[in-house]
């Protein structure tokens, strides 16, 4: 399954400047998702991080991976209607084993790859990795829960 940004906005509540997934390129319900974000110098975060040496913040990479995980969780809800999904939200529960291996700069394309470690009911545990040009730049274990708004 492929989702463009308009379709992603139908799934996630996030909007500019905090929608951090531009496209989903691969999705296997209940097990795997891959997508990307194009990092642009025109993003507001670069006004302060850092004006003379722009580096995309690691917390934004984590959030982008989490948003991709949210798409995976929502799209894996087979028996839910669009209306039911619209009344749900994904809450972060924990971030473990986070590592930042290389800086991300304007012009990079961040590729998110997430595998499900465990899913029990509304709780999802994900192995999340982010790449630029096939090089691992960040990774973490993410845990989240789908709840009613």
Swiss-Prot record:
Any Pfam family hit: FabA
Active-site residue numbers: 49
Claim: Lipid biosynthesis is one of the keywords in the record: yes
Known catalytic reactions: a (3R)-hydroxyacyl-[ACP] = a (2E)-enoyl-[ACP] + H2O
Gene Ontology MF annotations: (3R)-hydroxyacyl-[acyl-carrier-protein] dehydratase activity
Keyword Signal carried by entry: no
Family: Belongs to the thioester dehydratase family. FabZ subfamily.
Protein name according to UniProt: 3-hydroxyacyl-[acyl-carrier-protein] dehydratase FabZ
Native source organism of the sequence: Sulfurovum sp. (strain NBC37-1)
Lineage: Bacteria, Pseudomonadati, Campylobacterota, Epsilonproteobacteria, Campylobacterales
């Amino acid at each position: 399954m492929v989702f463009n940004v308009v379709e992603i906005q139908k799934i996630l509540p996030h909007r500019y400047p905090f929608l951090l997934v531009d496209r989903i390129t691969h999705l296997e319900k209940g097990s795997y998702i891959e997508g990307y974000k194009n990092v642009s110098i025109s993003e507001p975060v670069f006004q302060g991080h850092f004006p003379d040496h722009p580096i995309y913040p690691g917390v934004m990479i984590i959030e982008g991976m989490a948003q991709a995980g949210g798409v995976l969780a929502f799209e894996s809800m087979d028996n839910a209607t669009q209306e039911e999904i619209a009344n749900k939200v994904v809450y972060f529960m924990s971030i473990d084993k986070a590592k930042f291996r290389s800086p991300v700069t304007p012009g990079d394309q961040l590729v998110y790859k997430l595998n499900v470690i465990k899913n029990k009911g509304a709780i999802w545990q994900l192995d999340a990795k982010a790449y630029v040009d096939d090089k691992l730049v960040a990774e973490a274990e993410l845990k989240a829960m789908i709840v009613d708004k």
